[in-house]
Design a protein with these regions (language model features):
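Mature catalytic domains of secreted/periplasmic carbohydrate-active enzymes
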Residues: 1-180
Length: 180
């Protein structure tokens, strides 16, 4: 199963990264890929997948459960009070899968001297805080009245960017492809 799954994944990447022009960001969501979520480990060959992405789009950033930009530990658009981009990792490969590097995304003390002790290497691994504009990540008409206010979004921006993270707002298109 794992070989078939990885072959399929790489073929999908080949299609997406060769048919649509330059791609600057690939988001690999960590939800459901490890045993913490569904009780079993999903056998992705991350090194193969990331190498294929870099081969086809050399300038692409690999984000999420990936080696270039890490998940900030919440989906509320909020950075930590103290956020460090230098992180200690346990992976020896530069093309590590983000869930397997010894960084606990929800730790309040990432990047401190204590958290770096005993790690194999240090990497530049900036944080990204997700911010759904609605109640969840996808468009549902029932959520039209749950769109977050401008004041809330501005506060999230400053409490994320102002604390050394970037913010990824989710703007979900409706069935017509329009972002309401």
């Amino acid at each position: 199963c794992s070989s078939d799954l990885n072959d399929f994944y790489v073929k999908q990447l080949e299609e997406l990264l060769t048919n649509y022009g330059p791609v600057y960001l690939l988001w690999f969501d960590g939800a459901g890929v490890d045993s913490k979520v569904n009780g079993k480990q999903t056998p992705f060959d991350w090194e193969r997948i990331f190498k294929k992405a870099r081969e086809l789009q050399p300038d692409v950033l690999l984000s999420g459960a990936a080696p270039d930009v890490r998940w900030g530990g919440n989906e509320m658009g909020r950075g930590r009070e103290t956020e460090w981009c230098v992180q200690g990792v346990t992976a020896s490969s530069r093309l590590f899968g983000g869930n397997d590097v010894g960084i606990r995304a929800k730790d309040r003390n990432l990047g401190s001297i204590d958290s770096l002790a005993g790690k194999k290497r240090l990497v530049w691994y900036p944080s990204r805080a997700g911010l759904p504009i609605r109640r969840g990540w996808f468009y549902h008409e029932r959520d039209d009245k749950t769109i977050k206010s401008l004041d809330y979004l501005v506060d999230c921006y400053f409490s994320t960017v102002g604390q050394n993270s970037n913010v990824l707002p989710n703007l979900s298109p409706n069935k017509e492809g329009i972002i309401p």
